[in-house]
Amino acid sequence: GSEIGAHILSGAVMDPKALTELFPNWKELGAPLDTEVSQDQFLFLTKDSSFQVPNWMLPHCFKNEGNYIVSLANVTRWLGQQAENLGVEIFPGFPAAEILYNDTGAVCGVITGSMGLDKEGNPTDQFQLGMELRGKYTLFAEGSRGHLGKQLIAKFALDKDADPQSYGIGIKELWEVEPSKSKPGLVVHTAGWPLESDTYGGSFLYHLGDNKVAVGLVVGLSYKNPYLSPFEEFQRYKLHPKIRETFEGGKRIAYGARALTAGGLNSLPKMVFPGGALIGCDAGFLNASRIKGSHAAIKTGMLAAEAAVAAINENRSADELTTYPSAFQNSWLHTELNQARNFKPWMSKGLYLGTLMVGLEQKLLSGNVPWTVHLKHADHECLEPAAQHKPIDYPKPDGKITFDRLSSVFISNTNHAENQPVHLTLKNDSVPVDINLKTYAGPEQRYCPAGVYEYVETDGKPRLQINS
């Protein structure tokens, strides 16, 4: 992004544990953790009704006492200011485009993306060549499915001993609601409708200050029905009587979507390789049972940084920071993720069995169980042919509570020059039409929450158009 926080979607519940370790006096320093969670609600939804789970029945992972509802964009900006105050140089607006390797094959830095290229990749009069940024160690913190992180995992086979990774798409809106409906500190999580019981996912409402409410839906990408549209599921979620009442009379002010890495501890790849390490969601440290990853990103960043500093003080470079994974093994974060290791595998077996087993493990046994449940399949292997399913009839947007993709993207704080290079490219041009469209009815035109993928006809033949 053009500035720190530009790519962060506001509205998150943050566990301050790692931040307190990093800056014990964060309150005095003015960290923007302003709205402490005051109340938790967990609802099971059917199409027209809801059931609130009594708080005494909720597992600890669903409780948020001591946590804060924050604008994560503001938190990252504040962290950036603290880093710069300590002498750290930050280069916003310069994406890392390529990995640099030395003669032995170890990572030795990155190359930033070249600026001022046209749609065909040719230099314009605004051209600026990317820069080489070299270091003794490089830590990759791109977030979920980072494009360099994926390359590193493949090159060094970092995931060869891990379970298949599992992902979700999280779609979120920020609303300004009527003052009478604002309840700062209230956290609401829901399960059930609008998703089918065999589709992993859940929803949330976070009441921030200043009459702001963040609302979102997470859909696991292991769903079976290729006609499912996470965007449309989110829009109709807001039509539920229990949810709609919060937003009637309000105004939507921001929209966005992000990938989530949700496989958990058993899907974590090896975190280190010659010359660097993966941290945060680039590795997959999200605790899916808590829907929280920011505290894990801070903690793993600290552990990797401590390992790198120790190595440099020993005049080392470009080797493996083995003290980072060992420090993680001995950390409270490993304990937390270990207790939640079965959450995603259980929930992948359906809402009812998953809820029963998660309740047993997390509420009755506090996550301390002798067994481990493993994910067996990658998400894409779960998608079934369109012939086995019926198209889903989603309600038309009303422009008040529900909206279309185009108007949503307009308020997503994303923009690009029409003549800039397409940043999404296909490995095999024949796959979209010959497989995706023919067998699965073109699911990419539905799963993308920004309408990037579109099937159009050219000379009477369908082709996939990428609008990016």
Residue ranges and their predicted role:
Residues 1-49, 335, 339:
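N-terminal FAD cofactor-binding segment of flavoenzymes
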Residues 31-46, 331-465:
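Ferredoxin-type iron-sulfur electron-transfer modules and their immediate structural context
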Residues 173-196, 204-207, 211-213, 217, ...:
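Mid-to-C-terminal "cap/lid" subdomains and adjacent gly/pro-rich loops that border
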Residues 245-266:
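Flavin (FAD/FMN) cofactor-binding core of flavoprotein oxidoreductases
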Residues 284-290, 302, 306-352, 460-467:
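Active-site-proximal substrate-binding core of FAD-dependent oxidoreductases
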